[in-house]
Amino acid sequence: MKLGFIGTGALTSAIVTGLKSAADNSVPVLLSPRNEEVAASLALRYPDVRVAPDNQAVLDNCDTVMLAVRPQIARGVLAGLQFRRDHHVVSLIATLSREEIAALIAPVEHVTKALPMPMIAHRQGATIICPHNRRMAAFFGRLGKV
């Protein structure tokens, strides 16, 4: 898995921190430069976390992409991006439905909605995923309950 994040705020920070503190933390991570301070801090803390020059570079270099932007800017951020059919996109945007996200990121075939909580940084708490996806259940299962 080559994991990328579009949006670099508290939730992205929590997921990356939980992932990198797990026993098997070999998943490379590519962050969007959206929040320079958070992105730079994570890249300094973890050697296999890098900051991309822009959001499109995240998409071009990753097969799994988590959307972690605020709902009010999501449509604008996603509008100019070129997604691939083979991307697996995980939307962390609570107020947009899976169907709304799928329409914004066509031609992506695999869209999962996930709702983790910030305590995922400590590998605690539960993450709701919909629809059930074994790969994402295994990923989030390393960070808490699914």
Features from the language model and the residues they span:
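NAD(P)+-binding Rossmann beta1-loop-alpha1 motif at the extreme N-terminus of oxidoreductases
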Residues: M1-P53, N61
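Hydrophobic/aromatic beta-strand patches that form the interior of the parallel beta-sheet core
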Residues: L30, A52, V90, T112-A114, ...
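Short, hydrophobic beta-strand segments that form beta-sheet elements in well-ordered domains
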Residues: V29-R34, V89-S91, T127-P131
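A short acidic, helix-capping loop that chelates divalent metal ions and anchors anionic groups
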Residues: A39-A40, I120-Q124
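Short, polar loop motifs at secondary-structure junctions
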Residues: R34-V38, T95-S97, P131-R134
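Rossmann-fold NAD(P) dinucleotide-binding segment
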Residues: V51-I105
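Internal alpha-helical scaffold of NAD(P)-dependent oxidoreductase catalytic cores
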Residues: E100-H110, G125-V146
